[in-house]
Amino acid sequence: MSNQRIRIRLKAFDHRLIDQSTAEIVETAKRTGAQVRGPIPLPTRFERFTVLTSPHVNKDARDQYEIRTHKRLIDIVEPTDKTVDALMRLDLAAGVDVQISLG
């Protein structure tokens, strides 16, 4: 797989899960002899929701909630066949969304 690059984007709501998954991917790639660039932390997305607590009146009574989406980017430069095989077998946490692209 010469002149290839694997770009892995991770998304999660919990920053501890995404950091743990990132560490597993980086350690697996380095163990199989590939060069790793990253992990690069991408901007965290904040989604805020405001909900009226009262069903009828009292517009001043509100609750606010937010969801934070943490993102990381990992580039694996010059991956070997062992690297691809090891990454395919890797079992990551359930709360982490993984997008893989070859470039």
Curated annotation (Swiss-Prot):
UniProt GO MF annotations: structural constituent of ribosome; tRNA binding
SMART domains (UniProt xref): Ribosomal_S10
Pfam families: Ribosomal_S10 (PF00338)
Membrane-spanning residues: none
Alphabetic keyword roster: Ribonucleoprotein, Ribosomal protein
Signal peptide: none
Family annotation (Gene3D superfamilies): Ribosomal protein S10 domain (3.30.70.600)
A single BP term in Gene Ontology: translation
GO cellular component: ribonucleoprotein complex; ribosome
Self-association state and partner proteins as the record states: Part of the 30S ribosomal subunit.
Family membership noted in the UniProt record: Belongs to the universal ribosomal protein uS10 family.
PANTHER family: 30S RIBOSOMAL PROTEIN S10 FAMILY MEMBER
Function text: Involved in the binding of tRNA to the ribosomes.
HAMAP family tied to this protein: Ribosomal_uS10 (MF_00508)
Name of the protein in question: Small ribosomal subunit protein uS10
Gene label: rpsJ
